[in-house]
Amino acid sequence: MHGISRREALAGAAAGIGLAPRAARAAQASSAVTVGMIGTGSRGRFDGILFAQDGRARIVALCDIVPEQIENTRSAIPSTAKARAYKDYRELLADPSIDAVLIATPVFLHPEHFEAAVKAHKHIYIEKPAGADVAGVKRLLEAARQADKARHIVFGFQNRYSPEYNTAEEIVRTGKLGELLMMECHFIKGGAPIRPLDYPPEERLRHWGAWRDMSGDFIVEQDCHGLDILNWFAKAHPLKAIGSGGRIKRSYGDNFDHLSVTYEYPGGLRGMLVATQLTPPRYRDVREQFFGTRGVLETHRQYYKWDRGEGPIVKVDSKREITIDAVEIFLNKVLAGKPENTAFSACESTFTSILGRMAMDARRELTWEEMLRS
């Protein structure tokens, strides 16, 4: 069976609740969590900087198939100057002195690298999503079910660790928004055009984000963030989806550059995704909206906004970059010996993205069960 039970999914969904106090930072250097980085590209470096800045983590190993990426990471994170360098992730995982791994590799490699990290009994912080296709996510899901229950497993769905997102979820969960009628997520974000590198065959791997078989398309690689929030707030995954998308401007790779998908959740609740990469690089509209009988709630990495229909609109700004919260809570859990396995909700959110992509390709309504059988 490759589906996800509600108990598994809800266990993962609870990981962002009951956030450990930020005052827990003061740990002895000797008790620092030793971390190995698998994948040292731009996202890996971003996460690695936050681990290094926390003070309770020590990055002791770096792994990448591109040597210059390791050198770029040493420059960005001076404390890694003497970190051991690997080209083969299996050699890094074989090191018993490494407590945890930070995995930030191309999406299609996530199942393979996650499975190996589970077998090596490491704590795992792995970037989202859980895979690029149904088979890959099923592979990762099966590995998650075999994971050591003493090891903490977290995916890069960092919105779940933001205090502001948790407050917004509580507003919906406790009925303060009334009956939830509809949900929307927007992922409207441009970027510079991708130009092929000068050295094939490495070129395609270096630009993995442009290719469906490597990234899952941008509905999987990027839009999974918003869909993860819809699933979290709805306390369910969608039953079916219908949508359309295509390529207007993109000339490289085979991913879409715009799309729109409508998901149907239990009880007739609908969730809508609108996404495009056709905007100028500086333009960004990434947020979620929840429409209830008692108001409208908008969530964003930098705030939540609550219109209760009367009186002033409540707007609460985020205090800091929310990935800091995700890294801090990961280390809190590891050091406190209170592990959780969030792979199940991560797989559910990834499957939700894949369902939308498959519905667009099929040009018809597609059910959750059809997606899982593919």
What spans do the regions from the language model cover?
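N-terminal secretory signal peptides and thylakoid transit peptides that target proteins
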Residues: M1-A15
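N-terminal Rossmann-like dinucleotide-binding module
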Residues: G12-P78, L230
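Predominantly a Rossmann-like dinucleotide-binding segment in NAD(P)-dependent oxidoreductases
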Residues: G39, Q146-V154, Q158-G253, V261-Y263, ...
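Glycine- and charged-residue-rich phosphate/anionic-cofactor binding loop of Rossmann-like
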Residues: R58-I59, P312-V316, K333-S349
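Conserved SAM-binding strand-loop segment of SAM-dependent methyltransferases
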Residues: A83-D88
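N-terminal Rossmann-like NAD(P) cofactor-binding module of classical short-chain dehydrogenase/reductase
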Residues: V101-L102
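Beta-strand-loop-alpha-helix segment that lines the small-molecule cofactor/substrate pocket
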Residues: P106-V107, P111-Y161, G175, R363
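NAD(P)-dinucleotide binding in Rossmann-like oxidoreductases
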Residues: S251, N255, E264-D325
